[in-house]
């Protein structure tokens, strides 16, 4: 395999290539539009013949997430992918993974909902991804790519963060990013971790086989004594606090002198970057803040912009208004925060967002 390759491919396809190149040990999934190309590409590439990576189509999303649980318990780099309703079926398993502090990677290529909805792109799963993803007090690490290149790069970053914090990580994409084709630079092949490396790095928790010099590692999220369960929950919250302090990622475009700031992620942010250019051409000082990590969310940068004197924020999302709640919490009343969105698989255009910005903030009396 070449050390470095530049190819034209879909976002979903590049997930498969990145998984192999970044040393993934196993993929367990079930097909659902608009992300089915992830597993299809893996099947075509046959990594079991080159790197030894396991690729398996489970009988359901529920089975696939529980296979991920089993693989993650052994310290292996394992992953799955699905789209909105499929992720809902995985939610119990995601909670179990978080409760047992198991690292893994989940791809959600969002589609319009609720219910079966449509196969067109949406960002309606923000609450589901960022406010837990299942029952109980837990968080997933959530990365939001806005390009095919970032789909590729986030695979490595998500795995690294998942293992650093022993926590499930999600790449929250959408049908637009998953299906669009762009030039992408593929990473050099990383070798998969050896059993000896896994034993050294995951010795304290993974069930890779018990050596004589340590106690048994037991993987579970069960604790029937309330006092102990509270201690476990508090420890998890400390981990999330560390994530919020150390792992926030975001991008600012034209925010240095901005009077108004658009907040958008994923494919919406790509559209809104054109909105910023249009606004600047009209003499309007408009900037864009793009959260790259949706959890942990960039609260501090937003608060700093508000404290600096930004006159208003527009949260532009492909939903009825979800991330806007986190923007309002971050701004904390220092400036008006409004929402503009499209739903049901509809995308907004750059000029639509500019019109909304003017109506809701700039020209509002």
Annotate each PLM feature.
Residues 7-44:
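N-terminal glycine-rich anion-binding loops that anchor highly charged ligand groups
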Residues 37-131, 141-163:
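Thiamine diphosphate
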Residues 166-252:
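Conformationally flexible catalytic loops at phosphate/diphosphate-handling active centers
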């Amino acid at each position: 395999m070449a050390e470095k390759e530049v190819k034209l491919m879909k976002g979903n396809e590049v997930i498969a290539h990145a998984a192999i190149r970044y040393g993934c040990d196993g993929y367990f999934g079930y097909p659902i539009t608009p992300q089915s190309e992830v597993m299809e590409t893996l099947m075509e590439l046959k990594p079991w013949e080159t790197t030894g990576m396991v690729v398996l189509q489970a009988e359901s999303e529920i089975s696939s997430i529980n296979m991920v649980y089993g693989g993650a318990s052994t310290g292996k780099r394992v992953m799955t992918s699905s789209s909105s309703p499929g992720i809902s079926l995985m939610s119990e398993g995601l909670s179990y993974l978080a409760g047992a502090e198991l690292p893994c990677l989940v791809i959600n290529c969002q589609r319009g909902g609720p219910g079966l909805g449509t196969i067109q792109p949406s960002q309606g799963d923000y609450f589901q991804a960022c406010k837990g993803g299942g029952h109980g007090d837990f968080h997933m690490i959530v990365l939001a790519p806005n390009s095919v290149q970032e789909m590729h790069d986030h695979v490595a970053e998500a795995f690294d963060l998942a293992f650093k914090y022993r926590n499930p990580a999600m790449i929250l994409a959408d049908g637009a990013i998953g299906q669009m084709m762009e030039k992408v630079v593929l990473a050099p092949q990383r070798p998969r971790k050896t059993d000896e490396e896994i034993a050294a790095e995951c010795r304290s928790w993974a069930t890779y086989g018990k050596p004589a010099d340590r106690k048994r590692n037991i993987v579970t999220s069960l604790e029937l004594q309330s006092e102990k369960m509270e201690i476990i929950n508090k420890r998890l919250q400390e981990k999330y606090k560390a994530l919020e302090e150390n792992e926030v990622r975001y991008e600012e475009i034209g925010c240095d002198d901005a009077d108004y700031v658009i907040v958008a992620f994923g494919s919406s942010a790509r559209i809104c970057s054109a909105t910023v250019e249009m606004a600047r051409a009209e003499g309007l000082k408009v900037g864009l803040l793009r959260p790259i990590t949706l959890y942990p969310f960039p609260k501090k940068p937003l608060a700093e912009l508000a404290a600096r004197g930004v006159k208003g924020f527009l949260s532009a999302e492909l939903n009825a208004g979800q991330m806007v709640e986190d923007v309002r919490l971050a701004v904390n009343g220092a400036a008006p925060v409004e929402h503009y969105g499209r739903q049901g698989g509809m995308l907004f255009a750059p000029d639509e967002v500019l019109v909304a910005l003017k109506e809701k903030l700039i020209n509002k009396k």
